[in-house]
Amino acid sequence: MIPLNRRASQTRGGMEYFDARRKPHNVGKVIAALVLTTLCIFILKQSPGFGGSSVFSRHEPGVTHVLVTGGAGYIGSHASLRLLKDNYRVTIVDNLSRGNMGAVKVLQELFPQPGRLQFIYADLGDQKTVNKIFAENAFDAVMHFAAVAYVGESTLEPLRYYHNITSNTLLILEAMASHGVKTLIYSSTCATYGEPEKMPIVETTRQLPINPYGKAKKMAEDIILDFTKGRKDMAVMILRYFNVIGSDPEGRLGEAPRPELREHGRISGACFDAALGIIPGLKVKGTDYPTTDGTCIRDYIDVTDLVDAHVKALNKAEPSKVGIYNVGTGRGRSVKEFVDACKKATGVNIKIEYLSRRPGDYAEVYSDPTKINTELNWTAQYTDLKESLSVAWRWQKSHPRGYGSN
């Protein structure tokens, strides 16, 4: 018997007994919880990602889903912007070792609609991660930009370059093969040619790279070519481009290298840093080259033209074909010419310090773009050096600390 002075709700043996008089109140709570749960399930079912699926994991008629590796970087972010403007679906994969999350945020703000853009933070050197990305997303094409890309640094850390460029490209190809992705636009470089005896450079110019960066890219190209020989369904474009300058004409994106990488960066970045007073002056490495004024001669291609070439290559890619194209203006300019244009663009009389040559550099490199002009109907439009630098300078001046400032 239960003692008369014990309440029915007291515990016995670790169990709890509830007063029957409280039952209606608890039943009401249960009913309310069931209604709320049902409502949540209904709302969840309406969401694109219900059941582990999303628009990014399904092929959709009329929509081309492009994986942009290195899409948080300078060139990759500009390419992503162009693809999104042209109504492609874009997935950016980047480990942010060289890229900038600020660029991704700009793109996310410009294209917030569901199913337009997603960002995946990942290292393409991890095979399991790469396979997981391909397994969970329905890609129609890959634009492979991701790479460490400084000539000087490559001479100091060659193994890093072979791992990052050559090995990672191999992992991308294996994942493409496993998951049926049949279109590749590969970002290569004029550095694969080395220092040819004859100018301008055509696509059949012998490739004799002289630094680890160029060698790693050449090896990646060779792997791609060998891979496609046994796969007649593959559509591949290899774009060997020259020295990239400029930024988005509307001022949304720019070049923002990490502070620790500035010493290895492009000459345009160094010019702007000097104009902003971030560094005391510009260091020109090499004045004894066999050129008219003793400085290196390069073919400077505006990033807007460059990404246009990538989109045209994507549109023209055909199964069982490999297209190899130089992407340049066809005109070489010396470093001294470049510096003069930068001074005019910034309005700053930049201090110049002349130093000895940088290891792995070559005297003269410029392209013959006839093939890409003819086959892809592409021609560089932004060929005024001062104007390209002026556009880039406007972004740099308003973002002196990169995407962390405005």
Curated annotation (Swiss-Prot):
EC number: 5.1.3.5
Cofactor(s) essential for the protein: NAD(+)
UniProt KW keywords: Carbohydrate metabolism, Golgi apparatus, Isomerase, Membrane, NAD, Signal-anchor, Transmembrane, Transmembrane helix
Protein name (record): Probable UDP-arabinose 4-epimerase 3
Gene that encodes the chain: UEL-3
Subcellular location: Golgi apparatus, Golgi stack membrane
Membrane side Cytoplasmic: residue ranges: 1-26
Reaction catalyzed: UDP-beta-L-arabinopyranose = UDP-alpha-D-xylose
Pathway(s) per entry: Nucleotide-sugar biosynthesis; UDP-L-arabinose biosynthesis; UDP-L-arabinose from UDP-alpha-D-xylose: step 1/1; Cell wall biogenesis; cell wall polysaccharide biosynthesis
Phylogenetic lineage: Eukaryota, Viridiplantae, Streptophyta, Embryophyta, Tracheophyta
